[in-house]
Regions:
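Bacterial N-terminal signal peptides that target proteins for export
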Residues: 1-8
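C-terminal motif of bacterial Sec signal peptides marking the signal peptidase cleavage site
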Residues: 16-19
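Bacterial signal peptide processing site
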Residues: 21-24
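N-terminal low-complexity, Pro/Thr/Ser-rich intrinsically disordered segments
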Residues: 27-74
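Proteolytic processing hotspots in large secreted/extracellular or virion-associated proteins
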Residues: 39, 43-56, 101-154
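Self-processing/autoproteolytic domain segments and adjacent N-terminal interaction modules in large
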Residues: 54-128
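Proteolytic-maturation and junctional protease-sensitive modules
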Residues: 124-192
Length: 193
């Protein structure tokens, strides 16, 4: 009797797994397109890209972008400006770009200024993407002038990576720093290291 109950339970589990898409590592559900009776594939849906509500957002498409245009995205605090230069052919693809201050700042990131660039596609398709930070501080930076770095947060560890720096202006207490920002992620300024 116990064997029959066990067998019935095992078969029920197998049917349930098959109906739910099996035990793959993609969170359940079928991950491959399913064929219907006419032989055409039905694509799987992916989550839509969105910006956090307090970030600034810019949407681009092939039909609305002109060649070699400089487009600016500025945070409400006026400190961060992301300047995107469109390609010479004007073709950007459909693209959403976000700029803002993460709240809260990810654990382990220690910096005086932290801004995040998010993109639904590759910013390397643009002619350039530059982040400029304009701020006033009474802290004496070390090194001076300070620089913008990329904070790579992975596996609970934070690695600060150097970036190609642009023009900077450093006359205390006013600072303007610029750096290439063609990757989605956190851009930071550490006034003291």
């Amino acid at each position: 009797m116990k064997k029959k109950i066990f067998l019935a339970g095992l078969m029920g589990s197998a049917v349930l797994l098959a109906a739910c898409g099996g035990g793959d590592d993609n969170g359940g559900g079928a991950s491959a397109p399913a064929a219907n009776s006419t032989g055409t594939a039905t694509p799987t849906t992916t989550a839509a890209f969105s910006c956090p509500s307090d970030y600034k957002k810019m949407s681009l498409s092939n039909s609305s972008v002109i060649a070699n245009a400089n487009l600016n995205l500025r945070t409400d605090d006026g400190i961060a400006v992301l300047t995107i230069k469109t390609p010479a052919d004007g073709k950007t693809g459909d693209l959403i770009i976000c700029l803002g201050k993460p709240n809260p700042v990810p654990a382990g990131v220690k910096a005086d200024y932290v801004y995040e660039v998010k993109s639904s596609s590759d910013l390397h398709a643009m002619a350039s993407s530059t982040l400029t930070l304009n701020f006033t501080t009474n802290t004496v930076p070390n090194p001076n002038p300070p620089v913008i770095e990329f904070a790579d947060v992975s596996n609970g560890a934070v690695t600060y990576k150097s970036l190609t720096q642009g023009a900077s202006y450093a006359t205390a207490p006013n600072y303007t720093l610029a750096a290439s920002a063609q990757d989605s992620g956190l851009y930071v300024v550490r006034l003291t290291k």
